Amino acid sequence: MAAFTPQWNDWCPGCGNFGILNAEQQAIVELGVDTKNVVVVSGIGCSGKIPHFFRTPISGVHTLHGRAIAFATGIKLSNPDLVVIVNGGDGDLLGIGAGHFVAAGRRNVDMVVILHDNGVYGLTKGQASPTLKRGEKPKSLPRPNINDAVNPIALAISSGYTFVARGYAYDVKHLKELIKSAIKHKGLALIDVLQPCPTYNDINTKEWYDKRIYKLDTLPDWDPVVKKPEEVNEKIKRAIDKSLEWGDRIPIGIFYQNELVPSYEERIKANSPAYLDYTPAKQLIEKEGKLTTIIDPLLKEREVD
């Protein structure tokens, strides 16, 4: 298959990253996306290895710790024709990268962010990540965690993400469908993927999740899609309320979707009508060693007396 690679994979046996990788690969293939136009971006952590496991011509970009969203934003705005998928751990995206995570929601760039959510920093021996609940003590910690946890779903919705979902790494078929929906969505999409870390997190295990997870689309009255502006507040409230459900039952599926909000690309075009026809990736910036882009007139135009 076009997305798969024979590259040897050194994740721990049973790691949820295998399911996430598999779901991403299947989603890309089933959507029939031109693989030359797919870019997979990651930060640092166990999830950071994901770009290495996609076959060329899919492009992979392994970036700095916490900066995957920033890199991906630049890639997408330079060439809006690309399908850009960000992968990052809960520590990478919600710890050092939290500022970029929130700022991205205000822009609504048309790309997908996949959050690998296992409650620990798996690459550095299992320290508590921003999504580990206060008071929990996985085997990697000498004492219970004293910090409160971030709620990725609520944070994404309140920041402005227009597609917000939660998946489960061991339900690859369901996760694949969420990723396909996120790619097709026009705007910024987050998928918070619950994934067991069999090496360091002995609380949120496969057995623990299997007894609790249920799908939102099995609820008869669940409809996360905003169809008119008057519905926004109601849909947001329901989504955030449902995101707080954690314990005996944990919902997965689409929490919120709103395509009435213009993407960042559309907002740029409103100011620069030629943007989508003449994107930065198509522009010649130098010829025979000399710059062809002269910004002096642009700066002059924006001078303030």
UniProtKB/Swiss-Prot annotation:
UniProt remark on cofactor binding: Binds 1 [4Fe-4S] cluster per subunit. Binds 1 thiamine pyrophosphate per subunit.
Main localization, broad class: cytoplasm
Temperature sensitivity of activity: Optimum temperature is 90 degrees Celsius.
Residues annotated for Mg(2+) binding in this entry: D90, N118, V120
A family per Pfam: PFO_beta_C
UniProt GO MF annotations: 2-oxobutyrate synthase activity; 2-oxoglutarate synthase activity; 4 iron, 4 sulfur cluster binding; magnesium ion binding; pyruvate synthase activity; thiamine pyrophosphate binding
Required cofactor(s): [4Fe-4S] cluster; thiamine diphosphate; Mg(2+)
Name of the protein in question: 2-oxoacid:ferredoxin oxidoreductase subunit beta
Top-level EC class as recorded in UniProt: oxidoreductase
Site annotation Plays an important role in the binding of CoA: residues: K125
Chain's role: Catalyzes the coenzyme A-dependent oxidative decarboxylation of different 2-oxoacids such as 2-oxoglutarate, pyruvate and 2-oxobutyrate to form their CoA derivatives.
Organism name: Sulfolobus sp
Keywords noted in UniProt: 4Fe-4S, Cytoplasm, Iron, Iron-sulfur, Magnesium, Metal-binding, Oxidoreductase, Thiamine pyrophosphate
